Amino acid sequence: MESAIAKTGPITALGAMSGTSLDGVDAAIVVTDGVAIDGFGASAYEPYSDAQRAVLAKALGQWQGADVEAATGVIEQVHRTVLARFQQARLIGFHGQTLAHAPHTQGTLQVGDGAWLATALDRPVIWDFRTRDVEMGGEGAPLAPFFHFACAKYIGATQPLAFLNLGGVGNLTYVDPSFARPEEVGALLAFDTGPANAPVNDLVQARLGLAYDRDGQVAREGTVCQRVLERALTAPYFARIPPKSLDRNDFSQIVDLVDTLPDADAVATLTALSAAAVSQGVRHCPQVPQQVLVTGGGRKNPVLMEMLQSMLACPVKPVEDVGLDGDMLEAQAFAYLGVRVARGLPTSCPGTTGVRAPVGGGRISYPGTAAMAAQTG
């Protein structure tokens, strides 16, 4: 396949994401010039087996060693399997799997070799999106906000709104679509709100042998312990001014707070914490968004959605209500960001990660060649 990336016009790009929930790999096509979204294409999901998930979970929080190498192998092989289905893609935006994230001390680690994938798939691969942002003083996360800005334009939004991703960690993006470009001051504010699905998933796995609380069934049977909830909300992270970001394990001790609660009460309390973290986060926005559009697995939990609506002073709805795909939005984001990197456009800015100036990170690997830095800013 011809490996050159067109310098102008829309590109059929493929994005891939493996999130902190460790459920599997999402892959999706976006047609874009790196500024506007022309349209969306096919998508696919490849779940991890129980054995693969165990390998990944064992490596969480580690920076090197045998466990990290084993996790890298899982990520590369599963991505190769799912991405090979998309022969129409001209380039691939590959996020990899975050194992550790400590931007102000050790940096950030996403495993998976984009250069290896480029050769294996015979496509240019854009990868290592976060390192440059961290090197320039940013949090390295979240990175989806520039795509959220494009989505707001795509759906014709004219008033400020927010995108809320409820994965293992919650991420909020405030978008003012009156601005022309996402890097303009005031166009975006983005940050991690706090724990979302990860503590609940970990708890129901440990106590009940469940992968997650399907449809909020366990939480529905429980009662929120206000004492524990209020104590959890005293964590210093919630008072920090954004931009700010989290590692999946930063709130692992939260599960300890519900140790003495019955199963259903513990799950209900952790679910309420996810919603309360978002409610506190929205207070940091320049103004109350006209609507909050929810993506990620958390939007499928009716108890969590009800809690969010009760705590927020604006409509809360799944992104499907405006014609977007809540299962694939993060994968689509990395397709979009891949094109921006290839075109030399920024992928983060002070309002999204706290980086000193708008910057475009990432490396580009072509089939059979080494990776090249592709940076702006």
Swiss-Prot record:
ATP binds at residues 19-26. Keywords: ATP-binding, Carbohydrate metabolism, Kinase, Nucleotide-binding, Transferase. Pathway: Amino-sugar metabolism; 1,6-anhydro-N-acetylmuramate degradation; Cell wall biogenesis; peptidoglycan recycling. Its EC number is 2.7.1.170. One of its GO terms (biological process) is peptidoglycan turnover. It is an enzyme of class 2 (transferase). Pfam families: AnmK (PF03702). One of its GO terms (molecular function) is kinase activity. It catalyses: 1,6-anhydro-N-acetyl-beta-muramate + ATP + H2O = N-acetyl-D-muramate 6-phosphate + ADP + H(+). InterPro entries: Anhydro_N_Ac-Mur_kinase (IPR005338), ATPase_NBD (IPR043129). Catalyzes the specific phosphorylation of 1,6-anhydro-N-acetylmuramic acid (anhMurNAc) with the simultaneous cleavage of the 1,6-anhydro ring, generating MurNAc-6-P. Is required for the utilization of anhMurNAc either imported from the medium or derived from its own cell wall murein, and thus plays a role in cell wall recycling. Belongs to the anhydro-N-acetylmuramic acid kinase family. NCBIfam families: PRK09585.1-5. This is Anhydro-N-acetylmuramic acid kinase. The gene is anmK.
